[in-house]
Amino acid sequence: MLGPFKAAAIVGIGVSLTSFAPPPVFSAAALKALDPSRIATLFCGARRAGSSLAQNLLVAAAFAAPASEGRPIPLFPDLATSPFPVSTDKDNARRYFSQGLLLTYGFNHAGAVRSFREAQRLDRDCAMCWWGEAVALGPNINAPMDERDREAALDAMDRAMALRSTSTPMERALIEAVAKRYSRDPGSDRAALDANYADAMLDVARRFPGDDDVAVLTAEAVMNTSPWNYWEADKKTSVGRSGEAVRLVETVLSRNPGHVQANHLYIHLVEASDPQRAEAAADRLANPSAPSAAHLVHMPGHIYQLRGRHADSIRVNIA
C-alpha cells in the first residue's frame, strides 16, 4: 500500500524525495497504483474517493496549511522569479507575487493565497497582489469554488479594483476581467460567472496577444467553463471553446516552450485526445524549473502512462 507521503507526491502535495538508485523493477500492481490516469479519475475532476489510495491522499492533504494559516509562508527561491512585470517597488512583494502566481499555476491554491497575502502585507498598494488572491480563490478544473471563500474573493477583487488606477493597462485589464468572475448575490449562477470571466479574458488576450501569462490565464479561464471535458467522443472535435484554449497554449509553446503553465495546461488539454501531442511538454516539465511546485513535477506522468513510459511516470511521481 502506498503511504500518505508517497501518495502525496503523485498529485503534487509538497513531498520531495531527491533521488533513488538503482532503477527499480515495478510490478504490474505498482504500475496500476501509480497510473496517473487512474488517480485523475479519483481526484482530478472526480467528486468522490473510496479507495485506500484516496484515503492516503486525503491524509497527505491535511498536512497542507490552509490559506488562513497565521504564519507567513516562506519564499521558495525557485518560485520567486516569475518574469511577470508586476507593478510594485517592493522587491519582496514582487517575489511573493511571483510565488503566488506559480503556485496558482501549480494548483496549490492555498499556498498561492498565502503568498499573495504576504505580498499585500509588504505593499498594500499593489493592486495585482489583491488580483492574485481573487484569482486563486476561484474555481479550477479540479474543484468548484468553496462558497466559504466568496467574501474573501470579493474583498480582494474590490481592493484590486480600487487600486487599479496606478497599474499598467494590461494589469487593469486583468483586474477588470476578474471582477466579472464574482457576484455579491449568493444565488448567482456560477457557470454563467465562469463564462463571463472567460469572455472577459478572451478580450484581454486579444488586446495583449504577445503576453504569455495573459494567454495561459485566458486558456485556464476557458477550461474552467468545461472542466475535464474538452473533446467529443471522436477525440478530435473540441467541446465548446476548448479549441480556443488549445490555440492559446500552443501559441505560447511555439514562442516560449519553457513556460511551465503552458506545458501544464497542454497536458490537461490533449491527454484525452492525442497524448503524443503533449509528450514534448511532459519532457520539459520532467526537468522542472520550479521543483517546489510539486503538482507540476507530477504532471508528465499523465502523458508518460498513456504513452507506455511507465518507469518515467513513476520517476516523476516520486521525484
Task: Give the residues covered by each predicted segment.
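Bacterial N-terminal signal peptides
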Residues: 4-19
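Sequence context surrounding c-type heme c attachment/ligation sites in exported
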Residues: 294
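N-terminal alpha-helical interaction modules that lie
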Residues: 19-266, 271-275, 279-290, 306-319
